Design a protein with these regions (language model features):
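Membrane-integrated ABC transporters
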Residues: 1-47, 61-79, 92-100, 104, ...
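Short intracellular "coupling" helices and adjacent cytoplasmic loop segments at the cytosolic face
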Residues: 2-9, 105, 113-137, 141-143, ...
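An intracellular "coupling" helix at the cytosolic face of ABC transporter transmembrane type-1 domains
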Residues: 26-29, 124-128, 141-150, 154, ...
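Alpha-helical segments in transporter systems
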Residues: 30-52, 78, 82, 97-101, ...
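Transmembrane helices of ABC transporter permease
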Residues: 31-43, 78, 85, 155-206, ...
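Hydrophobic alpha-helical segments in the permease module
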Residues: 78-89, 93, 186-189, 259-279, ...
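Cytosolic ends of transmembrane helices, especially the final helix of ABC transmembrane type-1 domains
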Residues: 233, 257, 304-332
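ABC-type nucleotide-binding domain
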Residues: 348-600
Length: 600
């Protein structure tokens, strides 16, 4: 199972990530404005206005003593100003928190929908080449990346920009020389941080990719825990996990070392800045005649600015992590859909159910050059006809059914249903006209009732029970303590193979689609279970166009027609009796069967 694109983070990926984040953010322009306003206003009032008023108080104290009975008269306006500044500042602080919550909740909702829609509409080829656990992890990291970026923007980036502007604007008229030196130090500081950012960004992306792979390895082992245990391969899986864990740890370590190097250098620049401001504060009055209040203001503003600049390192680190976390899902979202509907694609209308495979050519995307499954295959299935597909493994039986369902697009030829090209119709309308029962029952970790009704969610309890009865599933469902409300576990692990298959068949019965595809639908059943289901399947197929894939030839012997495939070609076509009498490939397969199974 490959993990796609773990290369270092590229500028184009960063731009696309930021564009996607902005697309969901700009849907709330008022909240965005309030978040910027509250962040800038909060810093201006509680950091700069507060200090400015205190500087005025210091200057007034320095101007001369004030009698006790005149304190409120003299300092009353200053006290009132401080109270108002802090009151409004605290209100803006809470508004800042509120807007962040609103942005993150709404943004993550839209991003989750975007990821779900993208993943659910991607082709089966896309999903079979990836770990499901990694996709879940990438979705979670994509959302946490958005949350992290909103946090760092509102709580760090905007306050830092506000601090730089206010500090330079306040100090330039008072100490222009010091302001020039301060600006030069800031330029050097920001340039260094930017260079380190460009170095650390790909390291963060590599760390995120390693952690996603770790999640995929863990998910793969947990999902297939029965195979791990029955094969006694716990140690092997632990070694795989340890290798992925070490890779994630090593990636984290490399990233951490780069961050520590950056932090040491930026701390040195902060120390230099504070040394310069200390000299100016100490000699400011003697050299420039600056008042005590102004010296307090200079020191406080500069100190606050250096603290903000000190946060720039951690701010860039958080931006690195946020964009690195989001990078892999951004690439997934950017991938073209391998199977996509035309913008104006009509819905498929099935009136009879005739199926035609016309001059079909198909090869899997990861196949070697010149290695195809079908090359100019043509097959007609009349409306209402029951057709069995048989042949050795790899002959193309299941692939043909997948092309009918348009789980992949053909490279040449057409698949028609009632004369309509399925590639020109919407995928959803096509699949709602086909009841599909695969070899491995596809059950959700939900109740038996919900699983049966999945293809027809508006079905009544009576209809659900009747479908289960026809699939001979009620005989085990009624014995369960919670009956139809029994949770089946992930992929139906709480049920036996035969029970899972009967639930899947009940779903197909309830769907009542005009076309039926059975892909080894009874292969997981024991002889007793198969006997219970066979009659239900015969009733289900009556009056429906049915394609039955089987290795167990007794499953298809009674069908209207049997098509024998070999190496992607039709080598025989006829009824069971005709094919046995012909003495060809089918007769050979029939004669070699033991226990009703086709020799692999």
């Amino acid at each position: 199972m490959s993990q796609r694109n773990t290369s270092p983070l590229k500028r184009s990926t960063v731009r696309r990530t930021l564009q996607r984040f902005w697309d969901v953010t700009r849907t709330q322009p008022l909240i965005v404005f309030l978040s910027v306003f509250s962040s800038a206003g909060y810093i201006f009032l509680l950091t700069f206005a507060n200090t400015y008023v205190m500087a005025l108080i210091v200057d007034r104290v320095q101007a001369g003593p004030v009698a006790g009975d005149q304190v409120f008269e003299v300092f009353g306006p200053y006290i009132l100003a401080l109270v108002l500044v802090n009151l409004v500042g605290q209100i803006l602080s809470k508004l800042q928190d509120y807007t962040v919550y609103k942005l993150e909740i709404a943004g993550n909702y839209h991003l989750a929908r975007l990821c779900f829609d993208t993943l659910s509409n991607q082709s089966m080829t896309f999903h079979t080449s990836r770990f499901g656990g990694s996709l879940v992890s990438q979705t979670s990291r994509f959302m946490s990346g958005y949350t992290g970026l909103v946090d760092v923007t509102v709580y760090s980036l905007i306050p830092t920009i506000t601090s730089v502007i206010c500090t330079v604007a306040a100090l330039a008229p008072v100490v222009p020389t010091f302001t020039v030196i301060l600006v030069c130090i800031m330029v050097v500081y920001i340039a260094f941080v930017w260079l380190m950012y460009k170095r650390i960004m790909p390291l963060s992306a590599a760390t995120s990719a390693a952690q996603n792979k770790l999640s995929g390895v863990l998910s793969d082992a947990v999902t297939n825990i029965l195979a791990v245990k029955t094969c006694g391969r716990e140690d092997f899986e632990r070694d795989l996990f340890d290798a992925a864990d070490r890779a994630a740890r090593d990636a984290e370590t490399v990233s951490m070392h780069a961050m520590m190097q950056r932090n040491f250098t930026t701390s040195g620049l902060i120390v230099i800045t504070m040394a310069v401001v200390s000299v100016f504060v100490a000699g400011g009055n003697a050299w420039f005649g600056i008042s005590a209040g102004s010296l307090v203001m200079i020191f406080t503003y500069t100190y606050n600015l250096t603290m903000r600049l000190n946060y720039v390192s951690s701010m860039m680190q958080r931006i690195n992590r946020a964009l690195g976390d989001a990078a892999e899902m951004t690439r997934v979202l950017d991938e073209p859909r391998l199977v996509a509907d035309d913008p104006d694609a009509p819905e498929l209308k099935v009136t009879e159910g005739a199926i035609d495979f016309e001059h079909l050519s198909f090869a899997y995307r990861d196949a070697a050059a010149g290695e195809s499954v079908f090359d100019d295959l043509t097959l007609h299935v009349a409306a209402g006809q029951r057709v069995g597909l048989v042949g050795k493994s790899g002959s193309g039986k299941t692939t043909l059914t997948k092309l009918l369902l348009r789980l992949d697009d053909v490279q040449g030829g057409r698949v028609l249903v009632d004369g309509q090209d399925v590639s020109r119709c919407t995928q959803q309308s096509l699949r709602r006209q086909v009841a599909y029962v695969p070899q491995e029952a596809l059950l959700f970790h939900r109740s038996i009732r919900e699983n049966i009704a999945y293809g027809r969610p508006d079905a009544t309890d009576e209809q659900i029970r009747e479908a289960a009865r026809l699939a001979n599933a009620t005989e085990f469902i009624d014995r369960l303590p919670r009956g139809f409300d029994t949770m089946v576990g992930e992929r139906g692990v709480k049920l036996s193979g035969g029970q899972r298959q009967r639930v899947a068949i009940a779903r197909a019965i309830l769907t009542d689609a005009p076309i039926l595809v059975l892909d080894e639908a009874t292969s997981a059943l024991d002889s007793e279970s198969e006997a219970l289901v066979q009659e239900a399947l015969e009733n289900l197929m009556r009056g429906r166009t049915s394609i039955v894939v089987a290795h167990r030839l007794s499953t298809v012997a009674a069908l209207d027609r049997i098509v024998v495939l070999a190496d992607g070609e039709i080598v025989e076509d006829g009824t069971h009796t005709q094919l046995v009498e012909a003495g060809g490939e089918y007769a050979s397969l029939w004669s070699r069967q033991t226990g009703a199974f086709l020799e692999a």
